[in-house]
Amino acid sequence: MPLSNSCPGHTPSLSMADLVLAQGTVRNASFRDRVAAAAAAGFAGIGLACPAYARLRDEGWSDAALRSVLDDAGVRLLETEGLLGFSSFGTVRSGPLAGRRYADPRSEQAAFAMADAFGVRHVMVNGAFEGALEPDAVEAFAGLCDRAADHGLLVALEPVPCSTVPDLAAAVGVVTGAGRPNGGLCIDSWHLYRGGGDERSLEQVPADLVLVVQLDDGPVQPVDSHYLVDTMHHRQLPGEGELPLSAFLGVLRRTGVRAPVSVEVLSDTLDARTPAEVAALAADATRRVLRESGIGPRGAAR
């Protein structure tokens, strides 16, 4: 049966054998090129950030036109991201994301619109990049989950070391405190290890809380002293850096995690290549690492 992007409110059941081509891995690609690259490399689906979707709509793309491109290629639109500071107000004050609005209602509505139009499975959210976690963070996350549930959307909180949700323990506290069935975690290998986490901290996470795994690699020591600059420019393909990905994936497999793997490699080096080249390299590298960890990905390159 061909893949369809016309399943509003539908949350597909996926596993670690299903690969998603994250927005940032081919961040400079046009929508058509992104979809074509994902299809050629055998990805189950793609990610599209909330601001990117909003720009496409502003440029005149209709949901029907976007859906046609996806359906013709046999690719699902599975994830979205870009909800910053779910319990904060104002804007990011400094760094590469300066000026981005926290708890941006336009981004939230874009996520819900994508869920309604394409059956997007999950949206990733982060804490704020200044200050401390707000006292009402649990309540705010619960509210976001409730609004997302009306659109069949899962909400995956991603800990980022330089944010108000810096590690797995903090993220688990928010998610379990909120207690919403569509709320859970996005676990990124880069953020886990760059934030001082290890396999022991990963083993403490209940498997059913993990909604999506982001896989990437890189050097153990930072290339740039600014965390966000480093994370947005110097990642490497899985298996080509120094992070212990086999141990990372081994814990997830042993603890019974069933979540798709989103390949998110933010890299200036990859930016110099074509989207098709990047998608092929990312798929091959990820499948190799998964196989070595005893996880057999679905879908060979077409």
Kindly give the residue locations of the regions a language model identified.
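Conserved, mostly hydrophobic/aromatic
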Residues: A38, I46, L70, A115, ...
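Boundary/entry segment of secreted carbohydrate-active catalytic domains
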Residues: C7, P12-A29
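Active-site beta-loop-alpha junctions enriched in small/polar residues
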Residues: A22-V26, A49-Y53, G82-G85, A128-E130, ...
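Acidic (Asp/Glu)-rich catalytic clusters
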Residues: V35-A40, D58-T80, R106-G119, E139-D150, ...
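Acidic/histidine-rich catalytic cores of soluble enzymes
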Residues: I46, G143-E242, S293-G299
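Surface-exposed, active-site-proximal loop segments in enzymatic domains
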Residues: R55-W61, L83-R106, F129-P135, H226-Q236, ...
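Hydrophobic faces of well-ordered beta-strands that scaffold small-molecule active sites
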Residues: A17-Q23, I46-L48, L77-G82, V123-V125, ...
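Active-site acidic/histidine proton-transfer and metal-coordination neighborhood
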Residues: L3-T11, R32-D33, D72, S88-G184, ...
